[in-house]
Amino acid sequence: MSEAAEVSKQAYNIAVDTIGETWAQHLGSEFSKQYMKDLSATIKSERMSHVIYPEPQDVFNAYLITPYDKVRVVILGQDPYHNGAADGLAFSSKRENFIPQSLRNIFKEIGYAAVKSPNLQRWAEQGVLLLNTCLTVRKGLPNSHSKIGWQEFTFRTIQSLNDKEEPVVFILWGAHAQKYQEYIDKKHPILTSPHPSPFSAHRGFFGSGHFNWVNQYFRDFDKPEINW
């Protein structure tokens, strides 16, 4: 086996362990690239001197819980909660007693009669990829890891999803998420609105009807609906 092939095999094996086999088939080569090596080293160093969220075993949960071949919807977030509630899924909280304001507004838009668990794994298991564009953060410092290389990896993730033959619904809330719209082919439905944060939800997120639209879209194609 050539040195290049050996490196490629090692990168693929690391990817399988990190993001699961179906994602590794599309993103495995990223793990041999210098930016990913630098990113890994930076996070390792950061964890030695700072509290970093989410916990190491949760960083890639979006990939592990929603395999590539199961992705039907993508909801794009920014970075994890910096208060210890991050579980690796965008907008989700692992603390049952902590429902962030953005998530409260999401639940309100869905129309929940009663507040449900803030853990959104139930969505991820149905094919909703809850992907932050930055997968780690320092405690108490939002966007603190926004320039260490994560965006390159999540950009490659979006590119790989864009290549799917089966249309994927992309939900892009707010200006940050909408920057990625230009990289998504028109064959994929794209839903946009202001972010569900308390500062912008009343400017068009409320009443956007995205959750109903998604399920109507799946009904039209005889696909299973998402149980939001």
Regions found by a protein language model. Name each.
Residues K9-Q10, I14-L27:
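Generic N-terminal amphipathic, Lys/Arg-enriched alpha-helix
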